[in-house]
Amino acid sequence: MRLLFPFFFIIFMFQSFSFSQEWIIKNKWKISCGLVNKEALVINGKPKKTYSKNEFKVDGAIFKLNKGDVGKCKSDKKPTGGYKYSGRQEITHKLLPGKNIFEAEILTAGAPQYRSHFFQIHDGRSKGKPPSMVSVNKDWMIRNQHSIDCFKPNCKQLSYDAYLKPGERKNFKAEVEYKNKEKKISAKYYLDNELIIQHLNVPLDTKKTDGPYGPNRPYIKIGMYRIGDTGTTTFSYNKIVLKNKR
């Protein structure tokens, strides 16, 4: 029996290690800041009519903003980028240490805007750009933005021929590695399997941050955060998958 114990122990350790290397689906989202109105957010085909801080599962989400809709975050009422206010409807998910993959089919519709962020890695900072952001401009071209702590070649746009034009379904993927001990994130973004943006080894702000998951806890944001609205716009995210591997 004593001879068998080391054998079973080795098998147990191998299985535990193998399990730790497997991708695990994560699906605990919640509303960011609040609801603009009863039509601004649709989750899994059902409108979110009341604001709650509770978490929920998401397979598909539709974000809709009309001209003049102001977001519910405190900063949204303040002028920014030459515009009087920001429009916003977003949901968030905690970013876990290790490797993360977010995937979704994105479909836009409606009027253009000067700029609209549709994916962010945020660290809860109250001022300045967060570590990693992906947006569309008024011509629907995808552009990268990031904090001032990252420079080329670590942070750069690799393709200037990537668009989210209304009526065109696109497969978007984000590969994000969160190094908890180093307090850094690395992100690579793909559109229809083409690498279009990279933000590598971007430091997180560790001074005074206060996000929805507590101080110094980074998170993912998807949806619409825009300035320079010209009309009603929707961003639809279908087949949403978020998975993590430690």
Residue spans of the language-model regions?
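Ligand-recognition surfaces built from glycine- and aromatic
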Residues: 23, 28-31, 99, 203-246
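Extracellular glycan-recognition surfaces and repeat-rich motifs
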Residues: 31-69
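Short, aromatic/His-centered strand-loop micro-motif at the edge of beta-sheets
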Residues: 146-173
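Bacterial N-terminal signal peptides
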Residues: 6-15
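Carbohydrate-binding surfaces in secreted/extracellular proteins
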Residues: 171-202
